[in-house]
Amino acid sequence: MAKDSSRTLQSIWRFPVKGLMGQSLSCCNLAVNASLPGDREYAITTGSPITHEKLDAGWMNKRHFIQLCATSGVVGWQLLPDEAHEHLILLHHGTEIMRAPANAATPLMEALYQHQPEIFSGQPRLCRMSGDAYTDTPAPWISLGGSASLADFGKVTSTPPDNRRFRLNLIIETETPFEELDWAGRIMTIGSVTLEIIEPVGRCAAINVDPDTARADTDLLGMMRNHYNHSYLGMFARITTAGKICCSDRYQLTS
């Protein structure tokens, strides 16, 4: 069984609320056939009554929730759990607006709507998928991407390399841009954790939104397609052996 030379896991990212800013982690525990703990656990509806009628249906398509490609005004907002995961904290550009119990979050949605009503079609609601995630696919996968891919995208588009555009869970050290796109079907080991690499992550217009200014003046998605002849950055992966991973852990690929 062939093995690649060992390289490192550079960063771990969790995005507690779909479409909002995330947080970096130093370590996390991963379970078999599960998303990264706390990732996309919550989602905020657009305020549509049609969506609110379907809230008991479980996983729902991203069009029902606020997202960067449709509501760039969400840039700068965070909704994060406290250390005990008993309360949620609403922040805007790092400043706390308010906090409320995780199981009674209506005041948080009222505050968000009051501060920025133009990004909603009505009063939003906070949805929660306990034990699951509001990822773009209903499959319980995580996402990972190579450092060289982020760097090369930045070079081609004249933008700083920034995972906030792509919202990947794991950034791994790579030498060649987009080499990970050829890893489908391979097994990755990070510490005691193993993952099966599944398929590329297709990108949408959300990557056009500047994560600092919320402006989307440049068609970065179009530049990506013209330069690379594809719009993929990152790979989906399925956890096959549980365990703990930490930044700077070394990883290996087997085939």
Question: For each of these PLM feature ranges, what is it?
Answer:
Residues 1-255:
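Metal-cofactor-dependent catalytic cores
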